Amino acid sequence: RRRTNRILNPGLLTATALVLLALLWWVGATVFTDVRLSQATRHGAASTALDDARAAVLQARSNESLVLVARGGGRTSDAGYTARLDRVLGPGGLLDTASAAAGPAGALAIDEVRAAALGWRDAHGQLRALDDGGRYPDAVASAIGTDPAGSRAAFERLDTALGRALDEQRAALDRSAGAARSALTGLAAGPTVLALLAAAAAAAGIAIRVREYG
């Protein structure tokens, strides 16, 4: 029987390397996808909390207006304002939820929302002091006028800050989800192509070995 000194078969070595590369690709793409999906989930949670905060702020703005319309009979509406702002600003409230979900990258925008909400709450307190002190026209001017220190201006700053924070989180959500989709596409195609190439290389290697012993 004819002997050969060939020890390493290039085809089989190539097939082995391709299989290992396919495995590494699959593991890497899976980990990357999991990370991106986790990020997308967090940004989605932050967006939801900020959406809820914006809705609560709009309801509080309506409560503020109703108090002025009631002229002395708006205790219920003012309590509604306080309850809604507490839901936004209070411990474990919507801004805390959004901040925890967004992480350090979204902290600045959410801190700006918090500062604006505190500013509006202070402006509302001044509006109530004007109304309770018999200065109803001044209270109305604060609610609907253009004074930068008034309640309307403070509310608009808050609404703008909420809009910026929401846009930031939605954009981050889209980026993370898009990256996850791309990774899944690569996960489906890459290892499959490498496996086919490995099979072809293995077949070529076996054919060489068969000829050697033929």
Language model features: what each stretch is:
Residues 179-197:
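N-terminal membrane-entry
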Residues 63-118:
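Alpha-helical segments in soluble extracytoplasmic regions
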Residues 1, 156-179:
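Juxtamembrane amphipathic/hinge helix adjacent to a transmembrane helix
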Residues 25-43:
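N-terminal membrane-insertion alpha helix
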Residues 38-75, 115-132:
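N-terminal extracytoplasmic segments of bacterial inner-membrane proteins
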Residues 20, 24, 125, 157, ...:
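Polytopic transmembrane helical bundles with strong interfacial aromatic enrichment
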Residues 102-159, 174-177:
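Polar/charged, Q/E/K-enriched amphipathic alpha-helical segments with strong coiled-coil propensity
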Residues 1-18, 192-214:
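Juxtamembrane interface at the cytosolic side of transmembrane helices
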